[in-house]
């Protein structure tokens, strides 16, 4: 379910799991990446051509990080598809 706040700020939400919002900013361009926020923390993962790798992390517990990484890994195709649709790639 899309988060109205994210949409109002032009930040398309891809999905929400475990209390975390997975989204990207419309004005940010390459490299392909996804932001994650929730439970008082944030992270950013960039696509390296093979997988999403962590590039920023703040305030996310290890257990939550593992869940987030699993969600991203299992949904990489969806993330890439949504990115390409949004940026007309």
Predicted segments with their positions:
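Short leucine-rich amphipathic alpha-helices used at interfaces
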Residues: 14, 42-43, 86
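Generic detection of intrinsically disordered/low-complexity segments and helix-coil linkers/edges
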Residues: 16-19, 39-41, 59, 77, ...
